[in-house]
């Protein structure tokens, strides 16, 4: 922290204006995949009856925007984030239109390639890099704010989509939403997404803990690989309630509208608590925040295994949202703390590819296990096991970081 105070800050009122606009754009772009989640049962009924089909489409969207973030992050570094965001908005619209075609392959390509890879992929990872360059002192809080876009989308859109699907069908809902997000995102990007200020050249916040060409005394590739693996294993359980909560409620005889409201509660509490986790991350550091959030997540995930009533599920959903919300931005903050700023444009998208792959895998595993067992209990058990692996990896990194700091103190 002393090193941060030794140079002038780049943070201004414009920094927070940009972060707020980015939050709005992400809340709109992340709305697109939620249509498939809310309409999981009717889409499955029209495409062969297997829930793993729309679950895989959602998984492809998660994987797509993770992989697309690497490619589009490279494009944004050279052509500007405004270009990738405008392109992404148009591609989301195209992908939603293609998904309504009635064929399984159209759903997969529409969600995976257009909505995921070219659409959200052109916004999510490039925005993390872009916004991190507008901040130096409250970077954790800013990253927490923009990373809440997915949770604003999850809190806002499921009840709206549930009513829209019931009234007009999932196809019309996709078509109209695609047009709406283009009409809103393109002007916002054109007006507000200008070049960020130049950051002073300096070491990361934890640079003193690393010798040249090492991170915490380990090879950078090893540390980055461990962080990436940890993000995969933490996002497998993270995705399961988000992707299958409405369907779980329907199976238990709970109204679909209540299931959508439950999802909104989960993601609404995640949005609120993520701002708190950002404040914590600015003080504890990225890895310590990841470890703390992962402990809360595994406890809430275990509670899903033993909860069957509506009030209990609302309570567990809120607890899950409060616990897991700060994990992803804390991973990004850890990357900015541990690695050179010049490497952010590819390390952050690569990290988000890992986390997105974990989200994709978690959503698909839950659907596949449900199709095999006829219940979600095995899926939640698998989620708890994956979370335990995550805790082991992050715990090892935190212990290494603390021992290194103690040795240099």
Q: Which residues are covered by each model-predicted region?
A:
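Extracytoplasmic
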Residues: 17-51, 69-72, 157-158, 240-246
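Hydrophobic core of transmembrane alpha-helices in multi-pass small-molecule transporters
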Residues: 27, 95, 106-122, 232, ...
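Extracytoplasmic gate region of multi-pass secondary transporters
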Residues: 36-40, 222-275
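Conserved MFS/SLC helix-loop-helix module at the cytosolic interface between two early adjacent transmembrane helices
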Residues: 67-105, 281
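Intracellular juxtamembrane helix-capping segments at the cytosolic ends
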Residues: 121-135, 326-339
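Helix-loop-helix hairpin linking two adjacent transmembrane segments in secondary transporters
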Residues: 149-197
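Symmetry-related core transmembrane helices of the 12-TM Major Facilitator Superfamily/SLC fold
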Residues: 174-191, 378-396
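C-terminal transmembrane helical hairpin of 12-TM major facilitator-type secondary transporters
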Residues: 264-276, 281-334, 351
